[in-house]
């Protein structure tokens, strides 16, 4: 069973507007992926396209640095914290663990489907944006739990490594 309830920033107008925007983004991501699958694309083909978009994001939206702490500061913005009820769970010189306690995209997906397998795959494929960004640093990304899988929160571990995405498919 999916638990996905925002506990903080519920009275913050800006946070609510950003969340609504992300719910809508979740709806159109669902429709795009569903359309791609219906047109004959595979999950792997969709994954690679999303990952390439993440590589672009990595090169253009984040600082070019070898310092994971500097990256974490630019990643975990105040807006992202508010939208996702997020927090930095751990930060060392080699590892950044980001925790998401509410996902507006999952809320959007649940308006279209309650298929647990599809939701889990959709979540994983959306994380290819971040995997692609990690590729640009030669770092790894591992999902240690996701809201879409029923874990109650997403735990996203980004760490310095050999560049393979330890989250895998």
Question: What kind of feature is each model-predicted range?
Answer:
Residues 121-134:
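A conserved amphipathic terminal alpha-helix motif
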Residues 137:
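Conserved ATPase active-site switch/coordination loops adjacent to the nucleotide-binding site
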Residues 1-124, 140-154, 159-169:
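N-terminal accessory segment detector
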């Amino acid at each position: 069973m999916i638990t996905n309830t925002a506990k903080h920033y519920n009275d913050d107008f800006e946070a609510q507007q950003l969340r609504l925007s992300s719910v809508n983004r979740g709806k159109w991501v669902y429709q795009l992926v569903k359309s791609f699958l219906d047109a004959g694309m595979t999950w792997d083909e969709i994954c690679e396209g999303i990952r390439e978009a993440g590589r672009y994001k990595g090169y253009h939206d984040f600082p070019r640095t070898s310092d994971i702490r500097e990256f974490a500061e630019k990643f975990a913005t105040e807006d992202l914290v508010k939208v996702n009820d997020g927090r930095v769970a751990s930060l060392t010189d080699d590892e950044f663990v980001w925790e998401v306690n509410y996902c507006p995209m999952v809320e959007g997906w649940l308006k279209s489907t309650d298929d647990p397998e599809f939701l889990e795959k959709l979540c994983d494929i959306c994380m290819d944006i971040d995997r692609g960004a990690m590729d640009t640093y030669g770092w790894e990304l591992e999902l240690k739990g996701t809201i879409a899988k029923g874990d109650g929160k997403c735990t996203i571990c980004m760490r310095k490594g050999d560049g393979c995405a330890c989250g895998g498919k």
